[in-house]
Amino acid sequence: MSADIATIQAPIPPLSPADFSSEDLRYPVLKQHLEEFQLWLEHAFKAGISAEALISARSDYIDQLLQQLWYAYRFDKISSLSLIAVGGYGRRELHPLSDIDVLILSEQPLTPPQAQNVGQFITLLWDIRLEVGHSVRTLEECLLEGLSDLTIATNLIESRLICGDSSIFLRLQRHTFSDGFWPSTEFFDAKIVEQHERHQRYHSTSYNLEPDIKSSPGGLRDIHTLLWVARRHFGATSIDEMVDFGFLTAEERNELNECQSFLWRIRFALHLVVNRYDNRLLFDRQFSIAQLLGYHGERNQPVERMMKDFYRMTRRVSELNNMLLQLFDEAILALETNEKSRSLDSEFQLRGQLIDLIDETLFIKEPAAIMRMFYRMAEHEEVQGIYSTTLRHLRYARRNLSQPLCELPEARQIFMDILRHPRAVESAFVPMHRHSVLGAYTPLWGNIVGQMQFDLFHAYTVDEHTIRVLRKLESFANENNRPAHPLCVELYPRLPQPELLHLAALFHDIAKGRTGDHSELGADDALAFSLKHGLNSREADLVAWLVRHHLLMSVTAQRRDIQDPEIIKQFTHQILNETRLRYLICLTVADICATNVNLWNSWKQSLLRELYFSTENQLRQGNTPDFRERIRHNRFQALALLRQDNINEQKLHQLWSRCHADYFLRHTPKQLAWHAHHLVQHDSQESLILISTKPTRGGTEIFIWSVDRPSLFAAVVGELDRRNLSVHHAQIFTNRDGMTMDTFVVLEPNGHPLASDRHEIIRNALLQVVLAPHTKTPKTRKLPTKLRHFNVPTKVTFLPTHNERRTYMELFALDQPGLLARVGNIFAEMGVSLHGAHITTIGERVEDFFVLADKDHKALNKKVREELSERLTATLNPKDKI
């Protein structure tokens, strides 16, 4: 047994391959030995043995196994033939399910019998369930292919002899590390490009909530890149050896080892949980991994704590990776040595495009100088980063601060100067966050670094999301972004103090992860911070108000009936003035865009625009809208449009006389004209389906005219769900003759309006639904696997209203196939009539808003509300989650 395995105090150590008999090398016995070893790895890990020890043990085990089989197949009798470990196996990094990559190296091409024997050897390895990747090459083939392929070259650089002829392996090593085979400068440049392309695939952040432990920025590949570069240039075979060559300091070595150890531990646990090779921390695995690693807490706390540790580690890896590669480029490869530095002021100079300290002790002597450096970066557009040695001094000074930087009066003044600079975000705040200076400035920021939320809605950690909000706000100053965000690009330059908006953005989620309402807690923090930084009470109050109400506009637009003047009146009373409204719309749009790349769409844009202009109009008028005047206006404007088409006004009068007042109140003149144009030419007793050819509120509007019947809404939304369309808005009306006049706004799964080539298919499908004599209960699809790991208890809330004819209901539930149809069926069974709906899907949960009445057109009484709540809760709490 190897020394590594023998010294590990784990349950029942397995038999070492070095002690295998010829009987042990037979297929069934060998397979059993491997299964026992894999089981031992799992038990040993759960017993507390370190991942490092077990990874080393597996590498030793596989080495010894391959050596035994090499001799069993008599490959040692073939001259100039060797078995070489490459890739992760070459680095001795074998996790439970890592691939075992080997190179069979020969002087001359193998003879047919030799090749057949090698094939049988590899087949046996596959049969015993080893994931072996292999290549069989001559020395000349290796070098030729390595010259043209960076991956092969990298494998050769980190190769390791397992058994066989050592002389041919040493010749391979000499050629691989010669100046003619990927010189250091070329290898370095190629690895930088490779890393950049890999980071781009992961959106340049490790903060995606389902990261790849190996390949995401800050993951193990970033450590490997450092090892590869040092291995090629110095011949260093480990992180420890990199210190001996001056590539990194002892402190950096310790930090890198700590990060690698943590990532190895998570990856090891992941392999045990999934039981197949994969490096992605997907949602459905995170809870099991957190438990295996010993994280505790209520509900989602184990996952959130584990992921917070993960993100903080990957931040450290990213910073070390960037700094050390830059140092290697600048100092060791000595690129552009003739370039002279240029003074920026008495403290900082410019080396190329990088800012550099003149006095290396400045940050220690004057911590406020850290803030001065970032202000210089905002001031000087030519500065694109920080010089590597200055980064080292920054890291050292940051870790030796005696107090947060915000306690220094000079630092506070500089912070506000940065905040007021038009290039503050990209040039200062982004690098301040990247190098952990924001956390050093205020512990409030440090608390949210790496803070994730275990859901499908928030795509980034709280700190990453906040930086993206700031970036989006700064983008509103760019006229090129007007097509995407016309209202915000119009308003942002007119804000009297945009720095107040940026400060509110910085604090809007600062209290996430704490017990209590994060908006209220964050508002208190923002107020104290603002006053401490010299803002007057009016300015500080505005910042705190924005933080406290940063969700108000989004919730109102998406989960309230914004065509109800009473809702607009209530919202306006909370806003109070146009200044607040302008700040809030910009913050709201930026917040939505920075939450999830798929969240923003033309539907949400249209809702927010409508709410903004309705509120602006209300603020300017200063009185409650006259419903009757609005109805008269809508009818008059619609009639004007219809007269352009020579409408039959007698038939129009007959149609409109059968409609209730609400119909004219809640439709625009264009909608009224569109409906009437088709209905006056149509048999009033025949069903009609209209689909808008132009986007309405960013979606496609579907209008249904049909004889009303119970569960018609459920049947329609069930069919739309079956056709993979999402309903975002519904208005339900029945005229005096019992004909439905229902409107649905739908979107494709990509958030776009209905594709034109699907119009006729959808129209015919809906016509079949409304013509059917009975409503068929649609087949409910199974709950998607991704959703089964989330617990969203169904919650029904009835909102207060002064309207005696309507009940406003909010429904929070787990998103699930056929949800709207099931809700509609319950309404029908209870005799509850639906008059409107806003449908909002937020990750794994729905937050829907319904306007309801009883059969007598009155608000629901207490008994009906209680029964409705009970039935919805019982029906929508998923029972097939496992």
Swiss-Prot record:
<feature type="domain" description="HD">
    <location>
        <begin position="462"/>
        <end position="577"/>
    </location>
</feature>
<dbReference type="GO" id="GO:0008773">
    <property type="term" value="F:[protein-PII] uridylyltransferase activity"/>
</dbReference>
<dbReference type="InterPro" id="IPR043519">
    <property type="entry name" value="NT_sf"/>
</dbReference>
<feature type="region of interest" description="Uridylyltransferase">
    <location>
        <begin position="1"/>
        <end position="343"/>
    </location>
</feature>
<keyword id="KW-0677">Repeat</keyword>
<keyword id="KW-0460">Magnesium</keyword>
<feature type="region of interest" description="Uridylyl-removing">
    <location>
        <begin position="344"/>
        <end position="700"/>
    </location>
</feature>
<comment type="similarity">
    <text>Belongs to the GlnD family.</text>
</comment>
<keyword id="KW-0808">Transferase</keyword>
<dbReference type="GO" id="GO:0006808">
    <property type="term" value="P:regulation of nitrogen utilization"/>
</dbReference>
<dbReference type="Pfam" id="PF01966">
    <property type="entry name" value="HD"/>
</dbReference>
<dbReference type="Pfam" id="PF01842">
    <property type="entry name" value="ACT"/>
</dbReference>
<feature type="domain" description="ACT 1">
    <location>
        <begin position="701"/>
        <end position="778"/>
    </location>
</feature>
<feature type="domain" description="ACT 2">
    <location>
        <begin position="808"/>
        <end position="882"/>
    </location>
</feature>
<dbReference type="InterPro" id="IPR045865">
    <property type="entry name" value="ACT-like_dom_sf"/>
</dbReference>
<comment type="function">
    <text>Modifies, by uridylylation and deuridylylation, the PII regulatory proteins (GlnB and homologs), in response to the nitrogen status of the cell that GlnD senses through the glutamine level. Under low glutamine levels, catalyzes the conversion of the PII proteins and UTP to PII-UMP and PPi, while under higher glutamine levels, GlnD hydrolyzes PII-UMP to PII and UMP (deuridylylation). Thus, controls uridylylation state and activity of the PII proteins, and plays an important role in the regulation of nitrogen assimilation and metabolism.</text>
</comment>
<keyword id="KW-0548">Nucleotidyltransferase</keyword>
<keyword id="KW-0511">Multifunctional enzyme</keyword>
<dbReference type="InterPro" id="IPR002912">
    <property type="entry name" value="ACT_dom"/>
</dbReference>
<dbReference type="InterPro" id="IPR010043">
    <property type="entry name" value="UTase/UR"/>
</dbReference>
<keyword id="KW-0378">Hydrolase</keyword>
<dbReference type="InterPro" id="IPR013546">
    <property type="entry name" value="PII_UdlTrfase/GS_AdlTrfase"/>
</dbReference>
<dbReference type="InterPro" id="IPR003607">
    <property type="entry name" value="HD/PDEase_dom"/>
</dbReference>
<dbReference type="InterPro" id="IPR006674">
    <property type="entry name" value="HD_domain"/>
</dbReference>
<dbReference type="GO" id="GO:0008081">
    <property type="term" value="F:phosphoric diester hydrolase activity"/>
</dbReference>
<dbReference type="Pfam" id="PF08335">
    <property type="entry name" value="GlnD_UR_UTase"/>
</dbReference>
<protein>
    <recommendedName>
        <fullName>Bifunctional uridylyltransferase/uridylyl-removing enzyme</fullName>
        <ecNumber>2.7.7.59</ecNumber>
        <ecNumber>3.1.4.-</ecNumber>
    </recommendedName>
</protein>
